[in-house]
Amino acid sequence: MSIAADPPPEDAPRVSRRGRPARYTQDDLVAVVAQVFLERGYDAASMEDLARASGLTKSSLYHHVSGKEQLLRLAVNRALDALDGVFEDEARQADSPVRRLEHVVRRTTEVLVAELPYVTLLLRLRGNTEVEREALERRRSVDARLAGLVQDAMDAGQIRSDIDPRLVTRLLFGMVNSLVEWYRPGGHSPHGPAGGPVAPTVPTSRDEAIVQAVVELALDGLHARRD
C-alpha cells in the first residue's frame, strides 16, 4: 500500500514539507505514528500531530485511515502478530517441553529487539479504548500460552516445580519486557530520528549477546533441582 501526500507541481521534487519523501508505504506511516504515540502519548496525540510528523495533510491521512484508533491498531498489531508467530512456530517444534520453552523465551526477546517501538507501545496500553482492550486481550492470550509451556516443562520434571507457573510466566516476561526501559539499538533512541520513520532493526552481535543472556539467566534459574 502506498500513501501519497497532496501532489506537488510536476516539476517539483517528490518531497514533503520537511524534506522527507512524500510517498509512504503503510509500514512507513505506522512507524512514524508509533514514534508520535510514544513521544506524546496516545491520548495527547492528535491527527494534526500525526499528519505533521508524516508530512501528509490531514485530508490525505483521513483518506487512508479512519482515525488514530486504526493507526494504533496497526502499530500494536505489528508487535502482537510477531508474538503470535513465535507460538505458531513453537507449536511445530517436536522437541522437549523445556526446549520449546527456551525457543519461546529466545524468540520473544528477539521480537522485542526487532520491533522495539511497537512492543514498547503495546506495553504502555492501559485499556482506555476498545483498540487497547482488544490488544490487551491478545497479550493475555500470549501470557496464557507461555504459562502452558511452563506447566508442561514442570510436569515433565525438566524445570523446578516449587514456583507457581503463573509467577514464573510473569517473571519471564518481566525480564524480557524490561528491555524497553534501557535497550537502545546501536546506542540510539528506540523511537527513531525526530520526525522520521523508525529504521528497521538489524540484529548485531550485541543484540545476540543480550538475547543469549536473557535465555541463560531465565532457564538456568529454572533448572530442576537435583537432590
Predicted regions and their residues:
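Basic, helix-initiating cap at the start of DNA-binding domains
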Residues: M1-R40, A44-L56, E69-R73
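Hydrophobic alpha-helical connector segments
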Residues: L74, G85-A114, P165, T169-L172
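Key DNA-contact positions within bacterial/archaeal DNA-binding proteins
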Residues: S59
